[in-house]
A protein has these predicted regions:
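Bacterial N-terminal signal peptides that target proteins for export
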Residues: 1-7
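Transmembrane beta-barrel domains of bacterial outer-membrane proteins
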Residues: 56-57, 127, 135, 156-172, ...
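Bacterial N-terminal signal peptides
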Residues: 7-15
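Alpha-helical protein-protein interaction scaffolds
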Residues: 21-209
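Sec/Tat signal peptide C-region and signal peptidase I cleavage site
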Residues: 16-20
Length: 431
């Protein structure tokens, strides 16, 4: 949803004389003759230079002509001359907004700070002040103004959503969720409703902001041909099953896309053949994870490995993982769409001096089944692996796969929070 800002219009009952034979600059402005209105206001100010309404008219005309910097100067003069608090409040908001339109955000924030220092100014049309602060990229001031819950009654759909994104940027997760949900409710009363895609984007924001706990479970079965580097071992397939789970807890919330989490993880690997070349093992991890960039799904973690049986290991590990893609979640307006996904993961074990790495890229086509909660995705992929503890450290393979994913646990304001997926792959070693 595109951010927008609103500014309430001030209705002035003017007692000033009418200038010019055509009804004066006010009539020119009302008729859309903004150049004439600007010229007329300038002429009038030569004889009535202390009139704040004329300065405001000049400012409005310049704003319509796209001369935002000079419009801001005229609004500044109007606010200096105005004695009425409502008028001063409006003129200062308008000045800040014109500075924003002129690209002078720092100067706009200076005006907002001056208004906050005089509470009687921001007590007038507080919600408008908050929207101007958001436009000026001053989320701290905006959220300070929005501490006054009485202004929420004045929310429109757009102002509620703008306030939500601002609160999210400030790390005020609960407030952001409240505003997002309010915006979705207010959308029901709008003539031009949000599209399905826009509503879903907001529901996904709510999901991310409310997700403090996470649980991942996995069961996998694989067969793989043994490499010739293993010497005398038979060359038939090796069958293995792996079962694992991870639970994590965010500390401090979403942090505007930079969450910090603690986690625990347990995996058990079982080799099913009598001549297995590796022993069964149960391995545990406890650690911390941090996402340092809000716009990039890169996670770094540090953990302690704990052997939970005689074949598990005790060690310290650092790890980095990155992922992304398109078409991973259900899309709207179509029953099928392009799917792409990439994943990279590299970790290092200090005591064992071993590096592990995996990189995989997928491309395919996703098909929605039923009510869009179930997605079938055939895809092709390329996969690379690294294990410095092996004789042949690197590997490269490619193949095809089929994934069936069912999403569940959604509400009117929160997107699907969980899924179950069945994924089968066939791949051939390339190198």
């Amino acid at each position: 949803v595109r951010n927008a800002y609103t500014l309430a219009a001030l209705v002035c009952i003017l007692s000033t004389p009418v200038y010019g034979q055509d009804g004066g600059p006010f009539a020119d402005y009302d008729a859309g003759r903004f150049q004439q209105a600007e010229s007329g206001a300038e002429d009038a100010l030569e004889t009535d230079g202390q009139n704040p309404v004329l300065w405001a008219l000049l400012a409005e005309a310049r704003a319509k002509l796209g001369d935002h910097a000079n419009a801001a100067q005229a609004f500044a003069r109007a606010s200096q001359l105005a004695s009425d608090i409502d008028a001063r409040s409006y003129y200062m908001r308008a000045q800040a907004l014109q500075l924003v339109n002129a690209g002078q955000h720092a100067e706009a924030r200076t005006i907002i700070a001056a208004a906050l220092a005089e509470p009687s100014l921001t007590a007038v049309d507080t919600l408008d002040w908050a929207m101007v602060a958001i436009a000026a990229k001053d989320d701290a001031a905006a959220q300070q103004l929005l501490d006054d819950e009485s202004v929420y009654q004045g929310f429109t759909r757009q102002t509620a959503l703008d306030a939500a994104y601002s609160a999210k940027r400030r790390g005020l997760d609960k407030r952001a969720v409240r505003f997002f949900e309010r915006g979705l409710v207010l959308d029901e009363t709008e003539t031009e409703r949000l599209s399905d895609e826009e509503r879903e984007a907001i529901r996904r924001e709510v999901r991310e902001l409310t997700r403090d706990w996470s649980f991942i479970g996995q069961v996998s079965y694989s067969t793989s041909g043994r490499s010739n580097t293993l010497g005398a071992l038979p060359q038939d397939d090796q069958r293995a099953i792996q079962v694992g789970a991870e639970i994590s807890r965010r500390i401090g919330g979403w942090r505007n896309g930079r969450p910090f989490s603690v986690f625990g993880r347990v995996y058990h690997s079982e080799f099913l053949d009598d001549d297995a070349f590796a022993d069964d093992a149960t391995q545990g991890w406890v650690g911390v994870r941090y996402k340092p960039f809000s716009a990039l799904n890169l996670n770094v973690e540090g953990s302690r490995l704990i052997g939970l049986d005689r074949d598990g290991i005790d060690d310290w590990s650092v790890r980095a993982a990155i992922s992304g893609g398109e078409g991973i979640e259900p899309e709207f307006g179509t029953s099928d769409w392009s799917y792409s996904q990439f994943y990279g993961d590299i970790s290092y074990l200090f005591d064992n001096d071993v590096t592990y790495g995996i990189a995989e890229g997928r491309y395919g086509r996703a098909f929605a089944l039923g009510n869009r909660s179930t997605i079938l995705t055939p895809y092709g992929f390329v996969r690379a692996g690294l294990d410095t503890g092996r004789i042949q450290e690197g590997s490269l393979g490619a193949g095809g796969g089929l994934a069936l994913r069912h999403w569940f646990d959604e509400t009117d304001t929160t997107a699907w929070r969980g899924f179950i997926e069945f994924d089968i792959q066939a791949r051939e070693r390339i190198a």
